[in-house]
């Protein structure tokens, strides 16, 4: 067979373990895996690199269109360039922050139009479950190709902005789950108790307690666990498949494992920042590290890592949710925007912290960044290095420490809690459907080969 390109000399993570094999690429697909595949028009030398499936980040916020309200936030151009530089070849875009929120056919088509010609990586879409669009919106989104749905139990959205996202009440959650169950797709849920966290935050602010530690204390662990239990009950009642996003506590994971044992179709993810940062250092870092649910105590880090390593947590995401710098420029944690810019530093941080520091097998690494999200969200052509799959790869150089600087970031706004951190591995090349979209020496390709899925 004549290949368009062949990857040679790398340690390739396959589904049955890592091997020093060659990978032949034809028409954007993996066409062969083996030894001595021959020559081709192009040889991609992976010497010194670990070749992994490109990351599928299942939790990313892009704010385009901005609707005249958020036009200066992260858009498709910079967001997907950062993804490429970070080894992310596909991400699933959340239905909020953009204006209007993605809740029906009109809004998702507006989003597709806004992103046309701007994508460096592939982008799948979430549709939103909101109280104001329970009459037809879910079905319209299904017809327009969303891979899953998303709702919030925590308070969200700006009521002064027409068409902005809104959290669900119990009836909207129940009715939405019944409708989504009929599509066969997954409902991903931000599980925090809105009434309690809002009130505790209000009390702390009135008492002048505005530090990040006070913010964390206003969102205690039980305010994650309680809504997870409710979601499990609703899932049993409606038959809706569910997924808990950005889980930050071991107790919540354990509730999900119990439900799985009872036959509930439920999974969960955590985020890189919950496996890296900890409460005791937050005020030193500043509001750039504020997120929801909050980052918890250092004593919980290994408990969360153990649940990643044993498979209780299915995969890891960034929950990339950047904003303009002014929304982080405050000493009042309750007033700062709650979101972390982390899309570019999933692969390197997770490889360093998981593989290099905690002896995570390479097959498990590939599973948590690519294979498992591909399976959960039915991205059938993605997620593993196997014949017939899309030729999506990230090349990782192990034991290659570097200090992240602001100028290294491809985001629109160069703000991230990872700035100044020494990271012990590097992404050196990213390939999307056979096309090199990032190379450490050449930089990010200006060729916009990404596309919306489907």
UniProtKB/Swiss-Prot annotation:
Quaternary organization: Homotetramer.
Top-level taxon of the source organism: Bacteria
Record-listed Zn(2+) 1 binding positions: 59, 61, 150, 319
Record HAMAP family: Hydantoinase (MF_01645)
InterPro entries named among the record's database cross-references: Allantoinase, Allantoinase_bact, Amidohydro-rel, DHOase/Allantoinase_Hydrolase, Metal-dep_hydrolase_composite, Metal_Hydrolase
GO molecular function: allantoinase activity; cobalt ion binding; zinc ion binding
Originating species: Bacillus licheniformis (strain ATCC 14580 / DSM 13 / JCM 2505 / CCUG 7422 / NBRC 12200 / NCIMB 9375 / NCTC 10341 / NRRL NRS-1264 / Gibson 46)
Catalytic activity: (S)-allantoin + H2O = allantoate + H(+)
Cofactor: Zn(2+)
Protein name: Allantoinase
Sequence positions bearing N6-carboxylysine: 150
Purpose: Catalyzes the conversion of allantoin (5-ureidohydantoin) to allantoic acid by hydrolytic cleavage of the five-member hydantoin ring.
Involved pathway(s): Nitrogen metabolism; (S)-allantoin degradation; allantoate from (S)-allantoin: step 1/1
Gene Ontology biological process terms, A to Z: allantoin catabolic process; purine nucleobase catabolic process
Keyword tags: Hydrolase, Metal-binding, Purine metabolism, Zinc
UniProt remark on cofactor binding: Binds 2 Zn(2+) ions per subunit.
Family statement: Belongs to the metallo-dependent hydrolases superfamily. Allantoinase family.
């Amino acid at each position: 067979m004549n290949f368009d390109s062949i990857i040679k000399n790398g340690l390739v993570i396959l589904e049955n373990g890592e091997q020093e094999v060659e990978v032949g690429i034809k028409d954007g697909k993996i066409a062969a895996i083996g030894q001595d595949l021959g020559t081709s028009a192009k040889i991609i030398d992976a010497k010194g690199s670990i070749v992994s499936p490109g990351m599928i980040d299942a939790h990313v916020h892009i704010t385009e269109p901005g609707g005249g309200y958020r036009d200066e936030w992260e858009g498709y151009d910079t967001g997907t360039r950062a993804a490429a530089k970070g080894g992310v070849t596909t991400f699933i875009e959340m239905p909020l922050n953009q204006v209007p929120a993605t809740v029906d056919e009109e809004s998702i088509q507006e989003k597709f139009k806004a992103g046309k010609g701007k994508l460096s990586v592939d982008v799948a879409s979430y549709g939103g479950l909101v109280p104001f669009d329970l009459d037809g919106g879910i079905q319209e989104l299904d017809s327009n190709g969303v891979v899953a749905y998303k709702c919030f139990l925590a308070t969200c959205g700006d009521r002064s902005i027409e068409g902005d996202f809104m959290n669900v009440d119990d009836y909207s959650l129940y009715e939405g789950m019944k409708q989504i169950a009929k599509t066969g797709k997954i409902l991903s849920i931000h599980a925090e108790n809105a009434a309690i966290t809002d009130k505790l935050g209000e009390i702390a602010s009135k008492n002048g307690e505005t530090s990040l530690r006070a913010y964390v204390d206003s969102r205690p662990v039980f305010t994650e666990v309680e809504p997870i239990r409710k979601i499990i009950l609703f899932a049993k009642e409606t038959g809706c498949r569910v997924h808990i996003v950005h889980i930050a506590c071991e107790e919540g994971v354990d509730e999900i494992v119990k439900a799985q044992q009872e036959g509930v179709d439920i999974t969960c993810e955590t985020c890189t920042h919950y496996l890296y940062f900890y409460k005791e250092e937050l005020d030193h870092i500043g509001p750039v590290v504020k997120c929801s649910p909050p980052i918890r105590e250092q004593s919980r880090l290994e408990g969360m890592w153990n649940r990643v390593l044993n498979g209780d947590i299915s995969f890891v995401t960034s929950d990339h949710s950047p904003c303009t710098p002014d929304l982080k420029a405050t000493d009042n944690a309750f007033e700062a925007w709650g979101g972390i810019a982390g899309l570019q530093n999933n692969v390197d941080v997770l490889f360093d912290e998981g593989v290099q520091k905690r002896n995570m097998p390479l097959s498990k690494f590939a599973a948590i960044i690519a294979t498992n999200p591909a399976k959960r969200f039915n991205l059938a052509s993605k997620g593993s290095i196997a014949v017939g799959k899309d030729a999506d790869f990230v090349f990782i150089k192990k034991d290659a420490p570097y200090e992240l600087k602001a100028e290294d970031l491809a985001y629109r706004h160069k703000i991230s809690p990872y700035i100044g951190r020494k990271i012990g591995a590097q992404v050196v090349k990213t390939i999307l459907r056979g096309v090199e979209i990032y190379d450490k020496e050449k930089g990010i390709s200006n060729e916009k080969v990404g596309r919306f899925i489907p």
